Amino acid sequence: WADTYNLFDNWIRLNELLALSSYFETYLSCIIGLSFESDPGLLIGSIHSVDGIKLLKDGHTFKKEDFKQRIIDCTRGDWNSRISYMKSTFGSVPQSLIDGRSELDKMRILRNKVGHAFGRDIEKSRNYALTQIHNMETLKTKQFLKYQKMIKKIASDIDQQLMNNHIGNFQPLYHYHLLYPSAVRKLNDGERMMLLKKSIGGDIKETYSKDFCRWVVTYYDQL
C-alpha cells in the first residue's frame, strides 16, 4: 500500500509540474503579445516609436499573425534559444531568467515526459519491442517547491520589466477604447470617467480611482 501511495503521490507532483509549466508558458505568451500590442515598435526594433492605443483609435486593428511567430520563438524550444529571442526583442531579460535557465530546461524536459509519455522517457516509451514499462521519473516535494519559487520570481521580474517598459496603462486604455462608442455620447469628461470606473469595477472587478479614470479619458481623447 505504501509503495502504491508513493507512486500516486509522485504522479500528482508530476502533473502539478505539468500545470505549472503550462501556466507559465501561457503567461509568457500573453504578456509578450500584450507588449507588442502596446508598443508595436518592438516589431521593427524601434521601441516606443508607436503608441498602440493611437493605432487602435485611428482604426487600425492588430493582426495576431503580425507577432505570432515572435511569441512562438520566445515560448518554444530550449531555454537558451527562448532567452536569446527575448533579448533580441526586448533588449534585455531579467537576471533571474538567465540564472534559472538550466533549471528551466530540466523542468521543460520533465514536463514533456509527463505530457507525452506519462512521466517516462519519451524515446524509450516509443520502443515497441520493450517487454516492460519503465518507471516514471521521480519529482521530490522539495524540488517541486524549488521550481514553484523559481517560476514565481521569474514571472514577477518579467512582469515588472515588460509592464514598466512596454505595456504601461495599455489595458485600462484599451478597455476605454472599447467603451468609446458609447462614452463619446456623454456630455462631459466627468460622465465618461464615471462610465469607465463603473465598467472596470463591474466587468473586471478592479478598482481604480476617479483621478486615474479621468487621466485615462483625457489621455485617450487627446491622442
Stretch-by-stretch model annotation:
Residues W1-L110:
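Helix-loop junctions and short alpha-helical segments
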Residues A19, Y23, K106-K113, K146, ...:
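Charged, amphipathic alpha-helical oligomerization/scaffolding segments
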Residues L28-F36, N112-E123, S156-M163:
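Charged/polar positions within long, soluble alpha-helices
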Residues G33, E37-S46, V114, K124, ...:
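Generic marker of "main functional regions" within proteins
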